[in-house]
From Swiss-Prot:
Biased composition (Polar residues): 1-10
Protein's name according to its UniProt entry: Protein TraD
Region (Disordered): 1-25
Keywords: Plasmid
Entries under InterPro entries matching the protein: Conjugal_tfr_TraD_b/g-type
Similarity-based family: To plasmid IncP-alpha RP4 TraD.
Amino acid sequence: MNEQTTTNTAAHDEPLAVLPPVDDDAAGREAVREKMADALTPGFQVEFDPDEAERVGAFVEDALSEQDAAASGDDLVEVDGALEPAFLDDEGPSADIPPFITTTNARELYDLRPGETVAQAAARKASEG
């Protein structure tokens, strides 16, 4: 039979070292900060638990009220009916589809000046000849 001896050392007689209290709030903020930094990495998928998602504002209700939504549609009624898409060519804006479609912009085609509309630039170009 084996004989075992135990010795008491001074380390065993001392109480455990007192650990500082854990600040759960600070630890949670740090975890969320790290996850938000990871979320900015392209292709990296980060999972948030509901408490973390709430901390970063995932459940904040910021949608328009019904009254505000209805009021925001009123500005669409004020749009002039004359504003429609048009094809631009050397002869000016036209609703007819051109036989050859190329990409350009009004600045190049009409030498559009700052603050000038396409219609004004087309009229200016026509008057210049």
